[in-house]
Amino acid sequence: MNIQMAVLCDAVMVENEKLSLLGAFDTIITQQLPSPQRPAIHPQCAVAVRVTFSSGDEGPHQLEIKLINADGHGITPDFPPIPFKVELPEDLHFVTRNFTAIIQQLQFPEAGLYSVDIRFDGVSRASIPLLVKHATPGETK
């Protein structure tokens, strides 16, 4: 298993096995200082993961996407696991799969460092860092 890419972006589309991304980012700047009573809310984003599998990876697997804070605690209810099966035809040496998840109304109870943890079969294989910060005067993103 080779993770070619794991990214947080504004939008993602898969058509004819081609992965298209729009607006990859790693920082969210909020206009109000978030708190547990008034969390910062990001209206919509997407996670895109592209993975190449070889013959040793054949069989059933499960992908999990978890959003965690700097202390390692989840910030949202767990997304349902994505079960999938890897099968390679005899004439292929590898197969590539695209996985996407759309996240709406993502809430951040405080400014700070977060990450999107990508797990296959319960093992963390990639981590996408995400910084949530309060805007300074004149700053937007």
Predicted segments — roles?
Residues 2-109, 115-120, 124-141:
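Contiguous segments within soluble domain cores/interaction surfaces
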